[in-house]
Swiss-Prot record:
UniProt binding sites for Mg(2+): N245, D254
Organism from which the protein derives: Shewanella baltica (strain OS223)
Top-level EC class: transferase
Family assignment from sequence similarity: Belongs to the SELO family.
UniProt function note: Nucleotidyltransferase involved in the post-translational modification of proteins. It can catalyze the addition of adenosine monophosphate (AMP) or uridine monophosphate (UMP) to a protein, resulting in modifications known as AMPylation and UMPylation.
Keywords assigned: ATP-binding, Magnesium, Manganese, Metal-binding, Nucleotide-binding, Nucleotidyltransferase, Transferase
EC number: 2.7.7.-, 2.7.7.108
Record-level Gene Ontology MF annotations: AMPylase activity; ATP binding; magnesium ion binding
Protein name: Protein nucleotidyltransferase YdiU
InterPro entries in UniProt: SelO
Length: 484
């Protein structure tokens, strides 16, 4: 790897230098070939294993942990920071630079009495969801690898430590801006320094002046809205949408007790620590706006409040339009030639009625969309009909759907197109859990197979139909904790 060190050299007050503590008996548990290509790597090597497990220095790396704050479950925490993630720098790849971070690399000044470690189960989950989201075309950070060890760590019980090697276009979060506005009062100069760095590094088409700052914030609003639109379309619940877990670039970030929907449930909660459902699946669009409002508050020393409010008022449209585009593609609806508020409203109603029917009939979200690939949209008798208990309500919806769909000249091509946007395979929690149990038993094959399937989620993989099934009884409604 070849590194540059722009964050390290230009923002010295934004981090603490800290070196990783190596894990014992490191071994490759998983590796992403296409993530490796982003930073110019090919195959995992023994030398790389030693470096990324914290047991040897990586040439060109400067190790550091970033400081930031954030709103966690609605309350402001004035000092957070990377408690177990150590950044090596920005690795230069063929198409840009990516931060390389060792998540679980050991304690930092921000560990808050934690051990700075990640357990194997959380490392595997982060790796798999990074692969899954990327191949579902959802904006996300990436995971290069998972490195296992025999190092014991204690959570609710004894587990083994592991490291996720995370790649991110940037690790700058909403919480970075909050820290230098609220926690370090009177440091508007540092806020401006961070803003200028962010624009120069990631928005080089914008200027570092009043007009550029407003254009930048609008882009952040749009990117955040687009990310959440993708989450809602694929049925992904993040679980911990604190502002310190929000990437300034609109990439899915900091995965903990996440889940993909099995049975469709608007108020689905995937986080054991969120009994009131603040971050429930259906709440995510609203939380996205709330988090952007917190970011806007942090930017008031730099951008006038009236301008911030005007930009925030564009969030709803920035969310709805990509969501409509994604959902129209899932349903096979033709794109609207001339944008129309009325047509958007009608399509949102059609989509909403369909998901309400899914919830009422306790249907699997992913499987139901995939069934459209078997549908003859010209037939009065839908293959989907048998899945619904209240067929009269389905018939009413299906009639409206056919009317909106219009004529379909090439049915096989239409079906193929549906299968290209409606995945057959998602990272169901029970599949991740089965892979983790196998790793604990020394068997990496289920993990590697699951990774392979998740990199091709739209393919049939007829020999692996079992990975597309709804969860067994024990795997239904699994709720994960933040313990990792």
């Amino acid at each position: 790897m070849k590194f540059k060190q722009d964050f390290f050299t230009q923002l010295p007050e934004f981090y603490s230098q800290v070196y990783p503590q190596g894990i014992t008996k490191p071994e490759w548990l998983a590796w992403s070939d296409d993530a490796a290509q982003l930073i110019g790597l090919s195959q995992p090597t023994d030398e790389l294993l030693l470096g990324l497990s914290g047991n040897a220095a990586v040439d060109g790396a400067t190790y550091y942990a970033q400081v930031y704050s954030g709103h966690q479950f609605g309350g402001y925490t004035p000092r957070l920071g990377d408690g177990r993630s150590i950044i090596l720098g920005e690795a230069i790849g063929p198409n840009g630079a990516w931060d390389v971070a060792l998540k679980g690399g050991g304690p930092t000044p921000y560990s808050r009495r934690g051990d700075g470690r990640a357990v194997m189960r959380s490392a595997v989950r982060e790796f798999l969801v990074s692969e899954a989201l990327h191949h579902l075309h959802v904006p996300t950070t990436r995971a290069l690898a998972v490195i296992g060890s025999d190092l014991p760590v204690w959570r609710e019980s004894q587990e083994t430590a592991a490291i996720t090697v995370r790649l991110a276009r940037s690790h700058i979060r909403f919480g970075h801006f909050e820290f230098f506005c609220h926690s370090e009062r009177g440091r508007a100069d540092k806020l401006i320094q961070l803003l200028n760095f962010t624009i120069t590094q990631h928005y080089p088409h914008l200027s570092c002046d009043a007009a550029g700052y407003k254009a930048w914030f609008l882009q952040v609003v749009q990117d955040t809205a687009k990310m959440i639109a993708h989450w809602q379309a694929v049925g992904f619940a993040h679980g911990v949408m604190n502002t310190d877990n929000m990437s300034i670039l609109g990439d899915s970030f900091d995965f903990g007790p996440f889940a993909f929907l099995d049975t469709f449930q608007e108020d689905f909660i995937c986080n054991h620590s969120d009994p009131e459902g603040r971050y429930a699946f259906g709440q995510q669009p609203g939380v996205g706006l709330w988090n952007l409002q917190r970011l806007a508050q942090a930017l008031t020393p730099v951008i006038p409040s009236d301008d911030l409010i005007a930009i925030l008022n564009q969030y709803q449209e920035a969310l709805v339009q990509p969501y409509l585009r994604l959902m129209r593609a899932k349903l096979g609806l033709s794109a609207v030639d001339v944008p129309s508020v009325e047509q958007d409203k009608q399509d949102l109603d059609l989509i909403g009625r369909f998901t309400v029917l899914m919830e009422k009939n306790q249907l699997d979200y992913t499987q139901t969309w995939r069934q459209l690939g078997k549908l003859d949209p010209t037939s009065k008798h839908s293959a989907l009909r048998d899945d619904f208990i209240d067929v009269s309500q389905f018939d009413t919806w299906y009639q409206a759907y056919q009317q909106r769909l219009g004529a379909v000249a090439d049915i096989p091509a239409w079906q193929t197109e549906r299968n290209s946007v409606n995945p057959k395979y998602i990272l169901r929690n029970y599949l991740a859990q089965e892979a983790i149990i196998a790793v604990e038993e020394g068997n990496l094959a289920p993990l590697h197979l699951l990774q392979k399937i998740l990199t091709q989620p739209f393919a049939e993989h007829a020999e692996h139909e079992d990975l597309a099934k709804r969860p067994p009884d024990w795997g239904q409604g699994l709720i994960m904790s933040c313990s990792s």
